[in-house]
Amino acid sequence: MTQMIRTLRPLTLIAALALSSAAFAGGTHAGGHGHDSEETAIGKPGMASKASRTVTIEMTDNLRYTPADIQVKQGETVRFIVKNMGQVKHELSLGTQQELLEHLEQMRKFPDMEHDEPSKVTLAPGKQGEIIWQFTKAGTVNFACLMPGHYEAGMKGQVKVNKK
């Protein structure tokens, strides 16, 4: 009996470690993207009290955003109210084209992945959420729905950030 317990202890430990690492592998995908309170290639998370305006974006099952083209000024903080008007889950992810394509690959591998990043919101049908973002650099910031098949069908848009 003592020999059996000695044999089972290491096996139990190995099984527990394997299960806990698998649990962390799927989780949210906030890690590794650098989308926290620090500045990124597309700006940084904004503070609600500093938002100069609110832009409402509707997502629909025809796989489009309304509006899909938005103009902001460099340095401006915008509150995006994002509404899912459709019958399926949609998301809005802000990023560079490269970041969105990388994220698209992750979503293909983990389509049920939940977002925990200030530059992204995933919404069930009929729900709404918000993103508050400060656009610190002039240029183009892309946004897209990276649910499987949505991006490929054209569910994307742009924020043109004009110089001060």
Task: Identify the role of each PLM range.
Residues 20-22:
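N-terminal signal peptide c-region/cleavage motif recognized by signal peptidases
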Residues 86-89:
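Extended, low-complexity, turn-rich repeat/linker tracts enriched in Gly/Pro/Ser/Thr and Asp/Glu
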Residues 26-58, 99-113, 150-164:
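Extracytoplasmic/periplasmic copper-protein system
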Residues 91-95:
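Beta-strand signatures of extracellular beta-sandwich domains
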Residues 2-12:
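Bacterial N-terminal signal peptides that target proteins for export
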